Each structure stands twice: as C-alpha cells, then as structure tokens.
Amino acid sequence: MVNSSGHCSYYAAHMTGRSADAFLTIRAFGAIGNGLSYAIGVAAARPETQVVLIDGDGGFLMHAQELETIKRHGIKLLMIVMNDAAYGSEIHKLRVDGHDETGAAFGQTDLASVARGFGLGGVSFTNLEELDAAFEDFVSGKKAALWDFHISDQIASPVMRRLT
C-alpha cells in the first residue's frame, strides 16, 4: 500500500492487518501530489507484489498524466482515490478561519472516466455494495484500475480537527 501526504493519508495510516514494510507513505515530505508517481515506482520495483495507492483527488490530479505511463508499461496498479472535490486539508483550514474556500474547492471530477480514457479500468462508487464486483474484476484482470470514491468534503480527520 502506498499513500501520499494529503488529508486522506490519516485514514490509510490507521489501517490494520499489514506489516510496516507493506505500507509506504511520504507523509514526512509534507506535500501532496507525489502518491501516484511513488506508487508507480513501487510497482516497478516490486512486480511480484500487488500495489495499491490510496490518495485524494487533489493530489492525484497533480500527476494524472502518469496514467499514460501506467498503460504504456502495463503496470497493474490499483488506485483508490478519495474524491471530495477539494484540497481536503486546505478546505477545512479555510472554513475554521472563516475564509472563502473557493480556492480549495474545484468541483467533482469523474476520475473513473479519465482512467478509462487512458485504457485502464475505472469505477465510480455510489455505495460499498459495489466493492465485491469491482474487486473480482480487478483481481481477474490484467490492467490497472482507478476506483473513484465520491466522499463528503465536510468530514475532517481527527488530526485536522485538533489543528483547527
């Protein structure tokens, strides 16, 4: 599992049932936007291991063009994107301080369609009951897939709630 340093990284860091060497994160770096390129590198270095990226939509969109790299090199990577249509950390900070949040919100993007446009798998989830079928499709398939979870921008991580 690979995770970048955005707002959604809090939740990925608290997943159980994995060894420390199976969870790679760049939280110490402190900037979003590196998760996808990091996951590609891990998948290339560990071709025998199934790599899963968990990232936010803001960070993912900073390197979405790398979907072409994934397709060209035949990398089987599962990309899970928590899509709140915003830069999660920033929107919560702006709200607490009473500032205009339009600079942190950018509208809902259909990232599953973007992935399909690159010839990869793409699923937008509306409920968790769809997970089993998507999981079976990914496991039995030979190509990368992007799972686009449209989530609320109103929920802040416990860390963010303490900071704000």
Predicted regions and their residues:
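Glycine/aspartate-rich loop-and-adjacent alpha/beta segment that forms the canonical ThDP
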Residues: R95, L131, F135-T164
